[in-house]
Amino acid sequence: MKTKLLFLSLLGSFLAHAQTLQFKNLANMSAGRGAITSVIVNDNIYVSNGYLEKGGNANYIEKYNITDNKWSILNSTLLTKKFANSETYDNKIYIFNGWGNSHLEIVDLATNTITKGAVNRFYTGNAGSAIYNGKIYVFGGSGLSGAKSTVFSDKFQYYDIASNTWNPLPDMPTARETKGKIVNDKLYVIGGFNGTPSRLINVYDLKTNVWVNQYTMPSGISGHSLAVSGDKIFIVGGFNNQTFLAYFDTTTNKLHQLSSNMIPRRHAAAEIYNNKLYIIGGSTTSVTSSAIKSIQVADIN
C-alpha cells in the first residue's frame, strides 16, 4: 500500500476569520437520544435506535418532516441497539451494527415492514458506513464480532444490496471507531477513537480498491458526525470538543473550522438538505439522562 502522508495546514480564516453558522431550533424529538443513526429520504430525516434519556436503548425510528417541522414515530419493531449504522437505497433503510448486533434490518418505507438481510459476521459498534452504487461500505468500530468494546477494529467490508452478501475489502490503515463519507468515488474516513481521539483522515479509492492518501488534522476528533454538501464534508460535534464544527474540502484537502451557536453535543446525527445543515440528538456526558431532544438547522451557503 502506497500512502502519502500530508499535514493539513490551517488557513488564515481558520483562526482569525472563521465563518460563523447561525443555528435555529426546530421541533424536538419525542425523547432525548444519543448514539443514534440517521438517513435522509426526500424531505424526511429518519432517526434510528440509540440510547434514551430515561435509560435503555430505542427500538424505533422517528421521522422528521423538514417541510412541516414535525416528528412522528415510524416503526417500533426494531432490535434495540446503540452506536449502529443506517444507509438508504431505493426507498429502504438498511440498519446494522451496534454493539452485539449481527443482524441487518431492512425497513421498506412504502409498507413500513421490516425484513432481515444477510447476517453480518464482522459486526461492530461505533463504526463508519457509506453507500455507493448499491453497495454499503462499513469500516472500523469496536467490539468486533462480540469482543469487548475496548477492542478496536480495522475491518473493512461492503454489503452488496443486489446479492444480499457481505464481502471483505483491504483492512483500514489504523483500527479505530470512526466515521466516513464518499465524495467523487473516494471514501474519506475522518477521525475517530482507539484510546485517544484520532487526527487521521484516510482516503480509499473506490475505483482502484486501494487506500491512497492519509492526512493529519491539527487535532484529534471523536464522537462526531458527518454530512456531505458537494465537495465538502462537514464535521459536527465531538466527544471532548462538543461545539466543534468544521468542513474538509476534498478539492483542496484543507480543513476549515467554523464558529457557531450550536448546542454542545456528541454522538449526534447530521444531515444536509437544500444547503442547510441539520444536527439531531446526541448527548453531553456518558450518563443517558444527558441525551438531547434538540434538532437545530443552519444555512451553509
Feature names for model-found ranges:
Residues 1-22:
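Bacterial Sec-dependent N-terminal signal peptides
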